[in-house]
Amino acid sequence: MNLIYVTSLIFLFSFKSMAVDVHLPSAGFDCSDTNNKFEFLFDRSKDMDNPKVYRRIKGKFVLIGNLLAEKQGAYVIWEDKYFFTTTDFAWTFDKVTSKLSSIILSVGLGTEDLSKIPKPMTCMQKIFYY
């Protein structure tokens, strides 16, 4: 009897863990210029008021931070905790012109090469299936 109970629990938990890995399509931006390509997606599935932002890094979407501000039809600002290690860095997307640009919120230790910050670039809205 205990063996059936334990087997049933293992079976049910394995289905539950598989269900967590299912991802629905998410909206985001595909931004590029001659030197750089960035892909961002915004996950509002868990919290509509505090969406998580992901950036594709080495083929996988990695959590980079939170949405900081948004005005419908105008702009979106989100942090990127992965771009620099000690400098607070954010991206801005102008919804009117479809331009991505960056903001340095604060310089931490001042050891990072700020010249790697890309110039403003054009973006396209995109639905990501992952």
PLM region spans:
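N-terminal helix-cap/turn-to-beta initiation motif at the start of protein domains
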Residues: M18-D30, F128-Y129
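Edge beta-strand at a domain terminus
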Residues: S106-Y130
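N-terminal glycine/threonine-rich, aromatic-flanked beta-hairpin/loop signature
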Residues: F38-E70, S98-G110
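Classical Sec-dependent N-terminal signal peptides that target proteins to the secretory pathway
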Residues: M1-D21
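Contiguous, well-ordered beta-strand patches that form the walls/edges
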Residues: G59-T97
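Short, solvent-exposed loop/hinge segments that bridge or flank secondary-structure elements
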Residues: P25-R56, F83, T87-K95
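Tryptophan-centered short beta-strand motifs
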Residues: D21-H23, F61, L114
